[in-house]
């Protein structure tokens, strides 16, 4: 595994994580759709001032830990251009998570990780939303853990098979 400090681009790592997330949402995504999504993600992060320059993710690097910029949410992705069936399909699937019944995924994470023990209860998520929610929670926790490597931490994940089980994607299993 490549540590953040050894990676060429934090943005590339984040987009790789997002491609895994979208792979859970859209398991039959074509190569062309993946390319269009990749371009849309890079543009979205660029609109937030975040580029492949790792320093661009920080609002203030003089603090410890450094203060990061506000990150985009799903609703910040550009709207699909009219007339393009591939982007229209992606937009239709993602709209459930932006304005539809799963719009709670379209916001900044508000989990306080300063307590000694933290429980992320995803028991209310059912069906296709459970692996998506588990992936998002695990991705967030992993990013927080890697932010300060001076502290020892342990993660216990109940029901992880639902993220990496038979109905999941190879990319999600590799992430875990």
What do the PLM-derived regions correspond to, one by one?
Residues 1-176:
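P-loop NTPase motor domains
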């Amino acid at each position: 595994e490549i540590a953040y400090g050894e990676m060429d681009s934090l943005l590339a790592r984040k987009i790789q994580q997002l491609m895994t997330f979208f792979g859970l949402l859209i398991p039959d995504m074509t190569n062309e759709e993946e390319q269009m999504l990749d371009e849309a993600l890079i543009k979205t992060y660029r609109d937030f001032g975040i580029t492949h320059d790792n320093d661009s993710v920080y609002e203030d690097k003089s603090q410890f830990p450094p203060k990061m910029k506000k990150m985009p949410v799903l609703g910040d992705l550009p709207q699909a251009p009219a007339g393009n069936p591939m982007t229209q399909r992606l937009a239709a699937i993602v709209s459930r998570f932006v304005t539809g019944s799963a719009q709670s995924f379209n916001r900044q994470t508000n989990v306080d990780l300063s307590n000694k023990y933290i429980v992320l209860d995803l028991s209310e998520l059912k069906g296709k939303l459970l692996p998506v929610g588990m992936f998002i929670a695990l991705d967030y926790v992993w990013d927080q853990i890697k932010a300060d490597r001076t502290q020892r931490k342990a993660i216990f994940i109940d029901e992880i098979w639902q993220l990496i089980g038979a109905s999941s994607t190879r990319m999600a299993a590799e992430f875990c």
